[in-house]
């Protein structure tokens, strides 16, 4: 009679060990929710929607009596005064037509982005 009880206890102990060791793996592989662990659930943040509604709502909420920069939503007097979205990684160049472009510094030597912009202006690039 002791054998079935002992076997059940042994199986129960093994299931707890397997759940403790592999519970996180199974939760990640199969979407969580079930079994083992301490019942912890991770809450993931929502991605912004893939349509333009989020952007439009931010544009509509922006208050600007001058020019609202489309990429940074900064309020400036003239379009060529718009800042770059990532000023730590981009150089800003004002074009002759009163517009500006932002060029990634991405691994270029100092002044290399400016040289490439100048070559492009001349049609050599």
UniProtKB/Swiss-Prot annotation:
Keywords attached to this entry: Signal
Domain of life: Eukaryota
Secretion signal, residue range per the UniProt entry: 1-20
Its biological purpose: Probable component of the endoplasmic reticulum-associated degradation (ERAD) pathway.
Designated name of the protein: Long chronological lifespan protein 2
Gene coding for it: LCL2
Keyword field contains rRNA-binding: no
Organism: Pyricularia oryzae (strain 70-15 / ATCC MYA-4617 / FGSC 8958) (Rice blast fungus)
UniProt entry tagged with the keyword Nucleotide-binding: no
């Amino acid at each position: 009679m002791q054998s079935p009880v002992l076997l059940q206890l042994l199986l129960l102990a093994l299931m707890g060990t397997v759940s403790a060791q592999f519970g996180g793996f199974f939760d990640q592989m199969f979407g969580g929710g079930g079994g083992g662990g301490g019942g912890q659930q991770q809450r993931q943040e929502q991605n912004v929607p893939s349509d333009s509604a989020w952007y439009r709502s931010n544009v509509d909420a922006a208050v600007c009596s001058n020019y609202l920069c489309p990429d940074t939503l900064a309020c400036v007097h003239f379009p060529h005064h718009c800042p770059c979205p990532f000023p730590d990684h981009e150089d800003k160049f004002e074009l002759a037509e009163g517009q500006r472009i932002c060029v990634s510094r991405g691994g270029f030597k100092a002044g290399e982005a400016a040289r490439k912009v100048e070559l492009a202006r001349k049609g050599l690039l």
